[in-house]
Regions:
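Immediate flanking context of iron-sulfur cluster ligation sites
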Residues: 36-53, 73-80
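Membrane-helix exit/interface motif
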Residues: 31, 60-63
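Short cysteine clusters
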Residues: 55-58
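C-terminal structural segments of small proteins and small subunits
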Residues: 72-100
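Amphipathic, hydrophobic secondary-structure cores in small proteins
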Residues: 62-70
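Acidic, glycine/proline-rich low-complexity segments that act as flexible tails and inter-domain linkers
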Residues: 1-43, 67-68, 94-100
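Basic side chains
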Residues: 40-42, 62-63, 87
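Generic low-complexity, intrinsically disordered sequence content enriched
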Residues: 14-17, 48-51, 85, 90, ...
């Protein structure tokens, strides 16, 4: 179901909606480019978001990009736990709406 081979089909998106696809890819590249925040940290943030949205493609892409940017397994592990803490914290704080 979730084969990375599916990402090869993204080229069809560019053919069917070239202007929007070009704008999206330019935005994506600019957002993740080296800047005030180093690329490694941007990729770790992207990995946390991917874990939160539970997109298997995004997880794999940003895991590899984080490694390529110099992230260690220990850094990725801490990123996993930060993500888990925030997801759990959101459930707890949203639970306050249930209390009278």
């Amino acid at each position: 179901m979730y084969s990375m081979d599916n990402t090869k089909k993204l080229g069809k998106l560019s053919k069917l909606a070239p202007e929007a696809a070009k704008a999206f890819w330019a935005f994506d590249q600019a957002a993740l480019a080296e800047g005030a925040i180093p690329k490694k940290y941007k990729e770790l943030m992207a990995l946390c978001v991917a874990l939160t949205t539970q997109c298997p493609y995004c997880i794999e892409i940003h895991k590899q990009a984080a490694i390529n940017a110099g992230a260690s397994e220990e850094e990725m592990t801490e990123a996993i736990l930060v993500t888990a803490a925030l997801r759990a914290g959101a459930a707890v704080t949203h639970g306050s709406h249930l209390l009278s």
